[in-house]
């Protein structure tokens, strides 16, 4: 699973996921399913935001990479993936500027067009079950919830899906392709079933013990499906700016 994650996701997303896990004392090399889940969630947050801008009239527009009108304001502020201290600073700044209610939990995004925080969910289970869990945890009607599944289903607060159908389809296609590629590698079942994943982890650790010092052969062959997984959707200019912002540790 770790090899799959490193091949599948943008290096910045992998780095952010590793940083987040290490912040909580978790090892991406051991908790590989969680590593994959965090990377997936981060990528959906970025895809949700990418290419969406607000024009001078306050209307939401989509601008493709390389478009000369790149000086527009991004519609979404990405909060997920930032250092917690920085993330809360961003949230407080938004609340002070817009007057929106401060959330009790860190949200994933802020929508400048609709003036609301957004909680993004990516689930391997039924979307309505995960939606209710999120809603019960947040306990705020001010934070908008949008849940995606690996099967193409989605659920959002008051059936308001925020994005246009094409943008949402892009996210659903990406998730479905990740699922298909995991399945082709025999990784999907353990990703869905945590108990099976733990059993597999113990089995893998036992099999590695006798030859811990020997080199590991890693296949670098890229399957046709994985080629479609390569994350080409990210705006390179924004990626560089986000990388500098997200990975910069605050001084203590």
UniProtKB/Swiss-Prot annotation:
Disulfide bonds: none annotated. The active site is at 80, 108. The record marks 195, 198-199 as: Important for efficient shutoff activity and nuclear localization. Keywords: Decay of host mRNAs by virus, Eukaryotic host gene expression shutoff by virus, Host cytoplasm, Host gene expression shutoff by virus, Host mRNA suppression by virus, Host nucleus, Host-virus interaction. InterPro entries: PA/PA-X (IPR001009), PA/PA-X_sf (IPR038372). The record marks 202-203 as: Important for efficient shutoff activity. It is found in: Host cytoplasm; Host nucleus. The keyword Lyase does not apply. Residues 202-223 are annotated as: Disordered. It comes from the Viruses. Transmembrane segments: none annotated. GO terms for biological process: viral RNA genome replication; viral translational frameshifting. One of its GO terms (molecular function) is RNA binding. Belongs to the influenza viruses PA-X family. Plays a major role in the shutoff of the host protein expression by cleaving mRNAs probably via an endonuclease activity. This host shutoff allows the virus to escape from the host antiviral response. Hijacks host RNA splicing machinery to selectively target host RNAs containing introns for destruction. This may explain the preferential degradation of RNAs that have undergone co- or post-transcriptional processing. The probable endonuclease active site in the N-terminus and the basic amino acid cluster in the C-terminus are important for the shutoff activity. The C-terminus acts as a nuclear localization signal. The C-terminus is recruited to host protein complexes involved in nuclear Pol II RNA processing. This is Protein PA-X. It comes from Influenza A virus (strain A/Duck/England/1/1956 H11N6). The gene is PA.
């Amino acid at each position: 699973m770790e090899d799959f994650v490193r091949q599948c996701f943008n290096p910045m997303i992998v780095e952010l996921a590793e940083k987040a896990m290490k912040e909580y004392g978790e090892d991406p090399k051991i908790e590989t399913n969680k590593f994959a889940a965090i990377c997936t969630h981060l990528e959906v947050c970025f895809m949700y935001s990418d290419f969406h801008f607000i024009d001078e009239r306050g209307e939401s527009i989509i601008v493709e990479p390389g478009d000369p009108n790149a000086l527009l304001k991004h519609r979404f502020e990405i909060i997920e993936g930032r250092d917690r201290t920085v993330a809360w600073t961003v949230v407080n700044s938004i609340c002070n500027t817009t007057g929106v209610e401060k959330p009790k939990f860190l949200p994933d995004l802020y929508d400048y067009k609709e003036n609301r925080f957004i909680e993004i969910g990516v689930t391997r289970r039924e979307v309505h079950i995960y939606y209710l869990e999120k809603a019960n945890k947040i306990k705020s009607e001010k934070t908008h919830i949008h849940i995606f599944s690996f099967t193409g289903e989605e659920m959002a607060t008051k059936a308001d899906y925020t994005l246009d159908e094409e943008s949402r389809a892009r996210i659903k296609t990406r998730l479905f392709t990740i699922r298909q590629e995991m399945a082709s590698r025999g990784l999907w079942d353990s990703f869905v079933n945590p108990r099976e994943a733990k059993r597999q982890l113990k089995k893998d650790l036992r099999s590695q013990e006798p030859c811990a010092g020997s080199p590991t052969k890693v296949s670098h062959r890229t399957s046709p499906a994985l080629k479609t997984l390569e994350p080409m959707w990210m705006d390179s200019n924004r990626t560089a700016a986000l990388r500098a912002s997200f990975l910069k540790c605050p001084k203590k």
